[in-house]
Amino acid sequence: MDQSGVRNDAFGVDKFGLKNLKAVHWNLGTAALYEYALRNGEAELTREGALCAETGEFTGRSPKDKYTVRDALTDKTMSWSTNQSITPEQFAVLHADFIKHAEGMTLYAQDLCGGADPKFQIKTRVYTELAWHSLFIRTMLRRPETAALADFVPELTIIDLPSFRADPARHGVRSPTVVAIDFTRKIVLIGGTHYAGEMKKSVFTTLNFYLPEQGVLPMHCSANVGAKGDAAVFFGLSGTGKTTLSADPQRTLLGDDEHGWGPDGVFNFEGGCYAKTIRLSREAEPAIYDASLRFGAVLENVVVDSQTRAVDFDDGSKTENTRSAYPLDAIPNASPTGCAGQPKNIVMLAADAFGVLPPIAKLTPSQAMYHFLSGYTAKVAGTERGLGSEPQPEFSACFGAPFLPRDPTVYGEMLRKLIAKHNVDCWLVNTGWTGGKFGIGNRMPIKVTRALLTAALDGSLRNVTFRTDPYFGFAVPTALPGVPSDILDPINTWADKADFKKTAQALVSMFRQNFTKFEKLVDADVLAAAPDARQAAE
């Protein structure tokens, strides 16, 4: 077996059971991985310098193919109503078959860390069949110093083999695609999909399992920090604006997707960003646009001109879920440490497909807990398999239910205590539709959202007049300099006022119906923060 690159020979592939490999390339850098990816025909070089790969059939995550081993560790700690299980015996067979499948292969190995705070990070080794996958995960996780690689011992090991096909009868799964996690052995097996995002979300899921026991709240969020050290956290599902809104030139970027909130403050889990690029423009998002085109960026399913190799971010013919992975330091104002103090503001982003939520609302602590557990947004086409071309309303607990091994109330109660302890202001922001529901109205102008967020984060929004929303009970500003007053009250943007009322009542009913599963698990003040039952659809 040929090996190249810096590595810990005392803890090599044999420790994972890998054998009879053709070669292993350890901890290769960007240029070398470009060479292998291009030589292997895995990807193409774009005119501006980014590497572009296609993921084929799978252009998003496959949540129905994700499994966790149910054993003594997880039996009482996992939420099995929202997570699928396999037995230790089934995982052992699957693991052995992965090892067998890898024989004769050339693998790429990266030794990385999940978590910017050394006290809470997890050392992660990732074996990939594809060179571009190795570049992707090297970009997305945090890289240790080169000197640390010689004695690197992983706590978590991931092996990603897109050419592997699971056998449902043999492995206890539903299809040839599989993402299987064993928290006891700290092993993740990914097969049957080229979608690189499965790797990063597997690390996130692992941290979501272990960190609560260490007093750290793991969060599906972006985060940034102001000049005065005032950190802000942005919750939201894919497509709600986490990446876009946290990339504020006036604030330092911590990260765009995954963070922990611990005793010392907020810290990024990652070392890169994973931005949606559909209709990305330099005019609207210059920092993300430039970062996505530079040498070292990895593009997924973006259309590239076959002659000029120019990138077309407006073309969604392959998928709406086109993506760019780029290192955090590609953003001019990114934090070099990935760490900040305690947050001053929490923002919950919702892409409201019904167009009835206001562009911004201030939440009480109880309302914040309610909306965090509700996790309302709209699924956007392409970020998961099986969705049509239209967004679908979704309630995803903690704005990240697919990644939560434990019961959502574990994370919700942690958030509530942290908000109270640090006196955090909480906001709900609609980045979805205004002037009507999807298909009738328009997407909320990003300039309006940015203006409202700036006012919230700099404290000036505390000094304006608020009204109480008749449907949801939260406080909504009535006017703000530089923002059209009509847009602040959604009914004013609808041509058909009766249809607005009917649609708002329907959404109230959806909120209340969704929350029934939490009613016996939360305090009375959180229940009282629900939308007004009298406004629910009859």
From Swiss-Prot:
GO BP: any one term: gluconeogenesis
CDD domains: PEPCK_ATP
EC number of the protein: 4.1.1.49
GO MF entry, a single one: metal ion binding
SUPFAM superfamilies: PEP carboxykinase N-terminal domain (SSF68923), PEP carboxykinase-like (SSF53795)
Residues holding Mn(2+): 201, 220, 257
Xref: Pfam families: PEPCK_ATP
Gene Ontology, cellular component aspect: cytosol
This protein's pathway: Carbohydrate biosynthesis; gluconeogenesis
Cofactor: how bound: Binds 1 Mn(2+) ion per subunit.
Keywords: ATP-binding, Cytoplasm, Decarboxylase, Gluconeogenesis, Lyase, Manganese, Metal-binding, Nucleotide-binding
Residues engaged in binding substrate: 61, 195, 201, 323
Compartment annotation: Cytoplasm
Catalysed reaction equations from the record: oxaloacetate + ATP = phosphoenolpyruvate + ADP + CO2
InterPro entries documented for this protein: PEP_carboxykinase_ATP, PEP_carboxykinase_C, PEP_carboxykinase_N
Keyword Metal-binding: yes
Residues binding ATP, per UniProt: 201, 220, 236-244, 285, 323, 449
Source domain of life: Bacteria
Known cofactor(s): Mn(2+)
Enzyme class per UniProt: lyase
Function: Involved in the gluconeogenesis. Catalyzes the conversion of oxaloacetate (OAA) to phosphoenolpyruvate (PEP) through direct phosphoryl transfer between the nucleoside triphosphate and OAA.
PANTHER family, sorted: PHOSPHOENOLPYRUVATE CARBOXYKINASE (ATP), PHOSPHOENOLPYRUVATE CARBOXYKINASE ATP
Family: Belongs to the phosphoenolpyruvate carboxykinase (ATP) family.
HAMAP family: PEPCK_ATP
Protein name, entry field: Phosphoenolpyruvate carboxykinase (ATP)
Gene designation per UniProt: pckA
